[in-house]
């Protein structure tokens, strides 16, 4: 009886796996694209568009943002395809659609490749080649350099891999200017320095998860205290880099005051981590780090709008 049941269930299971996409919902595909990461990419790219010296062309800017968001989603989908084995082990990621079976691995990979291809192609045709090449670099760097090469090999994975997430404002800026200069590279630097502190606070809270998945994060390789000092160092560098737009005349005094206040709060969180025995504060700092970055880029947009209003009047 047992053998007969096993034989009958196998074709059914194969049929379900083969046509799993039919049971997937739009929400599953949205989750596959890591919407929180997409939102960050979209917002920082919009900031790049705003602070560009050239006049913004609404239609091309909209196309550029759609391409950047689609490219970020493509990278997220392929990342979930590749990391499905470790996502299955970790509590934080075990409900992802590639783990629960709502989207099959082959579907996730195909979906990601199609999105990546068309996002880069449309950017090249409708916007310009520089922003298209930068988008391709960002997607490729996240998938190949970070996900496939660094993530499972070194505790410094996020330091190097963070470059991919720092490119959206550069892409947005170049979509308007068709060039790269120190202005957009400053935005790149802020996100690049912010990323390690942001991720390591999360890794402090989920250390056991990463240990089970055998992913070499900094707390496991170098220890908790070393990680906290590293978070403090990168937080300090982030706050310093966030002041650069003022000292290079990209932003004014209002930006400096607001960014400094946000930076002091960020540094306070980093300093208090040393008394955080249960890593509860680490999770709070992780959440604040997202608010901090959004605020910094929002201040730049507000500053631009104020200058634009004064100029028009």
Swiss-Prot record:
Subcellular locations according to the entry: Cell inner membrane
MF-aspect GO terms: protoheme IX farnesyltransferase activity
Keyword flag Hydrolase: no
Alphabetized UniProt keyword annotations: Cell inner membrane, Cell membrane, Heme biosynthesis, Membrane, Transferase, Transmembrane, Transmembrane helix
Disulfide feature: none
EC nos: 2.5.1.141
Gene3D superfamilies referenced in this protein's UniProt entry, alphabetically: UbiA prenyltransferase
Gene Ontology, cellular component aspect: plasma membrane
Bilayer topology term: Multi-pass membrane protein
Any Pfam family hit: UbiA
Coiled coil: none
Recorded superkingdom: Bacteria
GO biological process per UniProt: heme O biosynthetic process
The reaction(s) this protein catalyses: heme b + (2E,6E)-farnesyl diphosphate + H2O = Fe(II)-heme o + diphosphate
Family: Belongs to the UbiA prenyltransferase family. Protoheme IX farnesyltransferase subfamily.
Other observations noted: Carbon 2 of the heme B porphyrin ring is defined according to the Fischer nomenclature.
Record's function text: Converts heme B (protoheme IX) to heme O by substitution of the vinyl group on carbon 2 of heme B porphyrin ring with a hydroxyethyl farnesyl side group.
Name of this chain's protein: Protoheme IX farnesyltransferase
Organism: Orientia tsutsugamushi (strain Boryong)
Gene: ctaB
């Amino acid at each position: 009886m047992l053998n007969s049941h096993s034989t009958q269930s196998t074709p059914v299971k194969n049929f379900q796996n083969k046509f799993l996409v039919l049971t997937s919902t739009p929400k599953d595909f949205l989750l596959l694209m890591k919407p929180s990461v997409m939102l960050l990419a979209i917002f920082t790219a919009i900031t790049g568009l705003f602070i560009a010296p050239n006049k913004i062309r609404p239609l091309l800017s909209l196309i550029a943002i759609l391409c950047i968001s689609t490219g970020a989603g493509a990278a997220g989908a392929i990342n979930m395809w590749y990391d499905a084995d470790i996502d299955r082990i970790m509590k934080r990621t075990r409900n992802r659609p590639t783990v629960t079976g709502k989207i099959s691995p082959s579907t996730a990979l195909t979906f990601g490749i199609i999105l990546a291809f068309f996002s880069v192609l449309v950017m090249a045709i409708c916007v310009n080649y520089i922003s298209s090449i930068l988008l391709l670099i960002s997607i490729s760097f996240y998938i190949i350099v970070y996900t496939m090469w660094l993530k499972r090999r070194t505790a410094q994975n996020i330091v190097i891999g963070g470059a991919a997430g720092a490119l959206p404002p550069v892409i947005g800026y170049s979509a308007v200017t068709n060039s790269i200069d120190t202005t957009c590279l400053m935005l790149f630097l802020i996100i690049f320095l912010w990323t390690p502190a942001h991720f390591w606070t999360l890794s402090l809270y989920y250390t056991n998860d990463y240990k089970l998945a055998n992913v070499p994060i900094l707390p496991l390789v170098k220890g908790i205290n070393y990680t906290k000092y590293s978070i403090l160092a990168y937080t300090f560098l982030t706050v310093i880099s966030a002041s650069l737009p003022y000292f290079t005349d990209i932003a004014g005094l209002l930006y400096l005051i607001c960014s400094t206040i946000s930076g002091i709060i960020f540094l306070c969180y980093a300093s208090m981590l040393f008394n955080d025995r249960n890593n509860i504060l680490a999770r709070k700092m992780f959440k604040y780090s997202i608010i901090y970055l959004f605020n910094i880029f929002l201040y730049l947009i507000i500053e631009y709008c104020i200058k634009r209003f004064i100029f028009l009047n």
